[in-house]
Amino acid sequence: MTEATLLRPHAEQLFAAELAALRTADALPAPPNWLMSPHAVVRYLLGGETVEGVEITPKYIGPRRIIEVAVATLATDRALLLLGVPGTAKTWVSEHLAAAVTGDSTLLVQGTAGTVEEAVRYGWNYARLIAEGPSQQALVPSPIMTAMRDGKIARLEELTRIPSEVQDALITVLSEKTLPIPELGGEVQATQGFNVIATANDRDRGVNDLSSALRRRFNTVVLPLPASLDDEVEIVTRRVADISGSLQLPEVPTSAEEIRRVVTVFRELRSGLTADGRNKLKQPSGTLSTAEAISVVTQGIAMSAHFGDGVLRPADTAAGIVGAVVKDPVNDAVVWLEYLEAVVRERDGWADFYRASRDVLHS
């Protein structure tokens, strides 16, 4: 399968030219088993410059210091915990950090309520285990064990979704940098370059608090929501362009005005305050994250291209916005109707969006 046919290439595949250019131009010392210096990793994440004739695109739009602290943590023996509400680019930053540092973002454990200890330690090929007994050949390493052996970065997504007793299996790995294998009478010791990047949020339902012992093994970096409307509009615009290209959606003249309108609605309902700060608003139950705004605009482009006139209009995004806001058909519907009547209806230039949103509710 060629890269062009992949629905979502890994960061090290999609941005291979940028990574190669930064490695070529990098004259600063790199930590053991790193492919580039910490300074070059930060340049890759923040972008906005041209290196060796290659434009380095921004992967993260936000305070530079946050990325510097994250990269500096990875250069030590401390694991990194990226903490934030849903939609603050935790997974995105984690993937790009791993791609820049080791060239491999695929050593991934996806945390769920059903994650078992074998996912973070090791498992067994039970056919060989029964036939031969415990052996290295019967051992099935987890991504974390593989990262320890190879001196790479393991990614642990949604750490707080994992049951607490499974979380605590990480303590020995993070503190002693070893993974005991009592069945074989041995252990795996981490080689230089090994580290763990975990992501977590404590806002969603169904999360498990981290124990104090485990939390002490991490340096925590909090990723905030975009600081300004302009920053969030830029993030949405860039990601929509990337996703539309990978999905090969028909070209649609993407209206900057429509993207700004979607982001404005999300920011106002998320904060419970209108953009001018004059009116307080009821807040819906959903998170209304930047990631959801990206999804709404991408869906709008598909609607416009396939069922509209090829221009992104309020009618194309209204259904997606209503779907993102109204998670609870009773309480959230009241919040949305009040917002439409009190804010959208009275706002200059928003009459078409008001009509489209009302049509969705009554369709």
Q: What is each residue range found by the language model?
A:
Residues S37, V116, V140, R155, ...:
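A diffuse structural propensity rather than consistent per-protein peaks
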Residues R64, E68, S142, D168, ...:
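Non-catalytic, well-ordered alpha-helical scaffold segments
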Residues D77, D104, A131, V221, ...:
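Amphipathic alpha-helical interaction segments
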Residues V173, V265, G320:
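Short acidic/histidine-centered micro-motifs embedded in hydrophobic/aromatic stretches
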Residues V233, V240-P314:
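Conserved AAA+ ATPase small/helical "lid" subdomain
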Residues A305-S363:
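C-terminal engagement/docking regions of AAA+ P-loop ATPases
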